[in-house]
């Protein structure tokens, strides 16, 4: 099962990385507390496969739709927000394709061999972090466009943003190194195979490190960045009072609130698990409760790949226009076979329609801010 510190090590497994941390048995040499976790394991074998299957189906459908719209309807020279969404969709797709492996592993055991153990664990970890990082990048992009009125299509600006995308993938790969190094298949005494990270005699230290890494890189730093970026965006919206100001403010608040609601319970549970391992507090009753909490909050956090892309995509007025164009083509093909090859509305038509409507999103406001900045510069030069 996809958990940082070896999910269900005695019955089911998952990556012991910095993204999800199950340690149901607490049987490390340095651990004093030893509790029976049969009830927790039984609950996980029923609850987690169902949740992972739902995440797989919903995440696959939503992100494939997002990917199709971005690849086929968005103009070839995409804005940075659309490139971030494109990378987010790819990352989420790679993440959700690992869910069936973990669902089978939790319900039964690992049956996919040593090679897929490493591949699936590494894919899980890399794209777990990439999803969070690209969400943060999108808030940075809106901040630069709206607050600093950064021109959208300057070569230097575009190059820096593309470099940021590359750095996101490299950073996610770097924090996933433990998956590549330590994860392997293990056979129990009764001949059952599991896939999880074996840290040897330093298991507790590694688990604490990976949990705190998740707390900082996967939650606290992105949350603080989003709060800062959207607070500044809100100040600009209040000062300029553009059309649709209220909707844009609500959208900015919703993006931060959704991120917090999805990720805070999970990260709090990971932090409490770390305190338990450090013997700050703990007994078997608390240990059991934390194990149940971890299964539920982890599932809530994983659902981000189903809902977040939709929320971000539909905050863009232009994306809604692209989606309408795709759906209209699909409906025409379904209703009238003779018009199956009728072309969708052109990019120029779509752009004109978008430009004629009121600005009601942060994305559109960012474009207007950049245009205003360029016009001021031209006037100053004259």
Curated annotation (Swiss-Prot):
Keyword Membrane: yes
Membrane-side (Cytoplasmic) residue stretches: 71-92, 141-162, 239-250, 315-382
Annotated tissue distribution: Predominantly expressed in spleen.
BP term (GO), one: inflammatory response
InterPro entries xref list: CCR1-9-like, Chemokine_rcpt, CXCR4/ACKR2, GPCR_Rhodpsn, GPCR_Rhodpsn_7TM
Pfam families registered for this protein in UniProt: 7tm_1
Modification note: Phosphorylated on serine residues in the C-terminal cytoplasmic tail.
Bilayer disposition of the protein: Multi-pass membrane protein
Compartments where found: Early endosome; Recycling endosome; Cell membrane
GO cellular component: actin filament; early endosome; external side of plasma membrane; plasma membrane; recycling endosome
Glycosylation sites: 17
Region (C-terminal cytoplasmic tail): 327-382
Free-text function comment from the UniProt entry: Atypical chemokine receptor that controls chemokine levels and localization via high-affinity chemokine binding that is uncoupled from classic ligand-driven signal transduction cascades, resulting instead in chemokine sequestration, degradation, or transcytosis. Also known as interceptor (internalizing receptor) or chemokine-scavenging receptor or chemokine decoy receptor. Acts as a receptor for chemokines including CCL2, CCL3, CCL3L1, CCL4, CCL5, CCL7, CCL8, CCL11, CCL13, CCL17, CCL22, CCL23, CCL24, SCYA2/MCP-1, SCY3/MIP-1-alpha, SCYA5/RANTES and SCYA7/MCP-3.
PANTHER family in UniProt: ATYPICAL CHEMOKINE RECEPTOR 2, CELL ADHESION MOLECULE
Protein name (record): Atypical chemokine receptor 2
UniProt lineage: Eukaryota, Metazoa, Chordata, Craniata, Vertebrata
């Amino acid at each position: 099962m996809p958990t940082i510190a070896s999910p269900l090590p005695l019955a089911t497994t998952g990556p012991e990385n910095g993204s999800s941390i199950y340690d149901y048995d607490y049987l490390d040499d340095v651990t004093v507390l030893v509790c029976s976790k049969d009830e927790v394991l039984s609950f996980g074998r029923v609850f987690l496969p169902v949740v992972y299957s739902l995440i797989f189906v919903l995440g696959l459908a939503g992100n494939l739709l997002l990917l199709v719209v971005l690849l086929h309807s968005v103009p070839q020279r995409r804005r940075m927000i659309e490139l971030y969404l494109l990378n987010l969709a790819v990352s989420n797709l790679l993440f959700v394709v690992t869910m069936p492996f973990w669902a089978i592993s939790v319900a039964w055991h690992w049956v996919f061999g040593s090679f897929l153990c490493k591949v699936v664990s590494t894919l899980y970890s890399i794209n777990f972090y990439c999803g969070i990082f690209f969400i943060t990048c999108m808030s940075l992009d809106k901040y630069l466009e709206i607050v600093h009125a950064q021109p959208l299509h300057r070569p230097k600006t575009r190059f820096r943003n593309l470099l940021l995308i590359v750095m996101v993938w490299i950073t996610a790969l770097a924090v996933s190194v433990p998956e590549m190094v330590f994860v392997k298949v293990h056979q129990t005494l009764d001949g059952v195979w599991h896939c999880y990270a074996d840290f040897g005699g330093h298991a507790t230290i590694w688990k604490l490190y990976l949990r705190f890494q998740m707390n900082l890189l996967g939650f606290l730093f992105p949350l603080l960045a989003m709060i800062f970026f959207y607070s500044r965006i809100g100040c600009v919206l209040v000062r300029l009072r553009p059309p649709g100001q209220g909707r844009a403010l609500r959208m900015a608040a919703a993006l931060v609130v959704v991120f917090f609601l999805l990720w805070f319970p999970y990260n709090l549970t990971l932090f409490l698990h770390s305190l338990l391992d450090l013997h700050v507090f703990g007994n078997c009753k608390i240990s059991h409760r934390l194990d149940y909490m971890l299964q539920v909050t982890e599932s809530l956090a994983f659902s981000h790949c189903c809902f977040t892309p939709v929320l971000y995509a539909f905050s863009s007025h232009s994306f809604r226009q692209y989606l309408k164009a795709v759906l209209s083509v699909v409906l025409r093909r379904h209703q009238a076979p003779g018009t199956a090859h009728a072309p969708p509305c052109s990019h120029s038509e779509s752009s004109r329609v978008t430009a004629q409507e009121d600005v009601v999103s942060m994305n559109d406001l960012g474009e207007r801010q950049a245009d205003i900045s360029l016009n001021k510069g031209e006037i100053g030069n004259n």
